[in-house]
């Protein structure tokens, strides 16, 4: 894979390539997370809440989002479910 970078050092070039791959992976995972949350907001059911909550927890455990953001998101979804 050819990555446009200003790096001259071999290890820096490799890190730039890895950063691109990781960015693509993280973007895809964040997009999937947002999709699950939007699905819950469109149709707030207990089953959709469980799916969204599980996705949020998984993202937080993998470091995709901060644990405080995960907690805040789950709290807001639970409040929406209660109403």
From Swiss-Prot:
Signal peptide: none
Annotated region (Disordered), positions in chain: 60-83
Keywords, alphabetical: Ribonucleoprotein, Ribosomal protein, RNA-binding, rRNA-binding
GO MF annotation list: small ribosomal subunit rRNA binding; structural constituent of ribosome
UniProt record, GO biological process: translation
One GO cellular component term: cytosol
Keyword Metal-binding included in the entry's annotation: no
Transmembrane portions of the chain: none
Cited Gene3D superfamilies: Ribosomal protein S20
Recorded family membership: Belongs to the bacterial ribosomal protein bS20 family.
Entry function: Binds directly to 16S ribosomal RNA.
Protein name in the entry: Small ribosomal subunit protein bS20
Species assigned in the record: Streptococcus thermophilus (strain ATCC BAA-250 / LMG 18311)
